[in-house]
Design a protein with these regions (language model features):
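Nucleotide-sugar donor-binding catalytic core of glycosyltransferases
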Residues: 1-41, 45, 54-66, 104-242, ...
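Active-site charged/polar residues at nucleotide-handling catalytic sites that mediate phosphoryl
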Residues: 44-45, 100, 306
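Active-site proximal beta-strand in glycosyltransferases
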Residues: 71-84
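Membrane-proximal helix-turn-helix segments that form the acceptor-binding/catalytic region
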Residues: 89-104, 175
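Conserved acidic donor-binding segment of nucleotide-sugar-dependent glycosyltransferases
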Residues: 269-275, 284-289
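Hydrophobic alpha-helical packing elements
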Residues: 278, 291, 295, 311-315
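A short, well-ordered alpha-helix in the C-terminal region of glycosyltransferases
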Residues: 291-305
């Protein structure tokens, strides 16, 4: 089966498409889209199905209309994987779906399945995962060596727009107590120098390292003693949860129902439900090398049930069941 992904963003093209390859499909990734690019790919690659994903430079209004027109003219099924739910369902995902008019939608948010169904949109749940060819345990790298690391964007403007967002609570539980107690945390990602209006703390400039290439993240996960995993929702996991564990990192994350549903705290990762508990856990595990190593190993084993190959196989099963594929 030939699958065409109309996408260019590193956080999207190095995950699910590789899972379909691992599942035995022939996969092509478009790169930046134009009418010429899409027309050429459809005629030369001759895909059986076309995927679009997430929120990127390839999901602008203009490109969404172009994708819809081109794929429908080729009489091919168009699938959209919604990775911005539930936060941006109304501001981004639904308007995009209305322009793309996909034949089927997968969403990372279970609670949105019923909502989309009531709107007449064919939909199923499909979570993030990780690709073991991208997120794997590497040798520690001196450039990224640190006691406590965070790989994430801060999103200060979005969080000021959504002051009740669970991500803020996660940040206040995991990061604020450490910074307030001058316990160094090394940050990779954008916007950490602008987070003070949201969290009420200023992160010291030497702790902030800026943008990190997506495919280099596992070097941090393999080199930091503790990785802080920020959660966006109570009922779903962030993408980096899977990626940190897949890279053999020692993960300290927020104590949420979904974390507990999928993993065993204290065995495969550790969780905190308060700033005080975060301080206690960090102080304990920074001294407990053997415990950290054991938990990391169990975590890497547990997360192997969440590879993108397995996600791809399940997507194909659903699409066949829904008669999108034959």
């Amino acid at each position: 089966m030939r699958i065409l992904f109309l996408e260019s963003h590193p956080m999207l093209i190095y995950g699910l498409p590789g899972g379909f390859r691992d599942a035995g499909c022939e996969v092509k990734i478009s790169g930046p889209l134009s009418l010429e690019t899409i027309t050429t790919l459809l005629s030369e690659f001759r895909p059986d199905i076309v995927f679009t994903m997430g929120w990127s430079n390839e999901t602008t209004d203009k490109k969404a209309h172009l994708i819809h027109k081109s794929v429908k003219a080729a009489k091919l099924p168009l699938i959209y994987w919604a990775t911005e739910d539930p936060t941006h369902t109304h501001s981004f995902t639904l308007p995009l779906i209305q322009k793309l008019k996909p034949d089927f939608v997968f969403t990372i948010c279970r609670e949105r399945v019923g909502y989309y169904s009531k709107l007449g949109i064919r939909v199923a749940h499909m979570d993030f995962g990780y690709h073991p060819g991208i997120h794997f345990k590497s040798d520690p790298n001196a450039r990224y060596s640190c006691e406590i690391g965070v790989v994430a964007n801060a999103y200060p403007r979005i969080l000021q727009k959504y002051p009740q967002h669970h991500r803020i609570e996660s940040l206040k539980t995991l990061i604020v107590p450490l910074v307030k107690n001058n316990i160094r945390v090394d940050f990779w990602g954008k916007g950490w120098d602008e987070i003070e209006p949201v969290l009420g703390i200023k992160i010291p400039e030497p702790w902030i390292h800026g943008y990190l290439e997506y495919c280099d993240a596992n070097l941090v996960y393999s080199s930091a003693s503790i990785l802080l995993g920020i959660q966006n929702q109570l009922t779903q996991l962030s993408q980096r949860t899977y990626e940190i564990m897949g890279s053999g990192g020692f993960l300290l994350t927020s104590d949420t129902p979904e974390v507990r549903r999928l993993f065993s705290p204290g065995r495969e990762l550790v969780v905190s439900s308060s700033p005080e508990q975060t301080l206690e856990l960090v102080r304990h595990y920074l001294k407990a090398d053997a415990e950290r190593q054991q938990i990391s190993q169990w975590g890497q084993k547990a997360v192997s049930a969440h590879t993108y190959q397995l996600r791809a196989i399940e997507m194909l099963r659903i699409l066949k069941e829904e008669k999108i594929l034959h």
